[in-house]
């Protein structure tokens, strides 16, 4: 594969991972908020209590998702930057050892000895640091994920996912709130299950059924709990 094609594939894979994470974040928003509003609506018919409970859950969930994503990506970025610093130090202190290290990495990644030697020689004529970090650690050199971008994306995806259950539980009349919300959430879960399976190249039917089952179980449990504490 040419260097240009490899770069295109890497960029596409990165965008695909971001999109998949967005779909999963939206899925979390759908299930989490559906569970909260169904449970509260089962316990009380007071629309303001239902709305405030759902709104608080949206804020808590979105900030929790964003905070977790920020910490996770920041840790990953720190680890990747430390790996780059180590390889840079190796290049500065012992060029021959760095060459042997890159050659061994190519061999480990499936190249034959001749090809590994050619690739090593070529890398040290161009950008040895880039080759070292990409081959040894699988890191895209100078393409570190921004933790703020990841956090904002996670916040938005969770918020968007929370809209179907939140809107349906507040818009529909009292007698239709719960069944309408279950129906709308079910459709939304089927869509996110289908989308995540397509992005991951997995069987769509299995993913859709699994996603729907988890959502229905969540809503069923919170509905029963709401009935126990009905006011």
Feature map (PLM): residue ranges:
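Cytosol/matrix-facing amphipathic helices and coiled-coil assembly/linker segments
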Residues: 2-14, 73-155
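Interfacial loop-to-transmembrane junctions
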Residues: 191-216
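Core segments of transmembrane alpha-helices
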Residues: 29-34, 154-165
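Structural signature of hydrophobic alpha-helical transmembrane segments
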Residues: 175-187
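Helix-coil boundary and interhelical linker segments in multi-pass alpha-helical membrane proteins
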Residues: 38-53, 166-177, 224-231
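The feature identifies polytopic integral membrane transport proteins across all domains of life
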Residues: 14-25, 47-54, 115, 147-152, ...
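Internal alpha-helical transmembrane segments
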Residues: 1-72
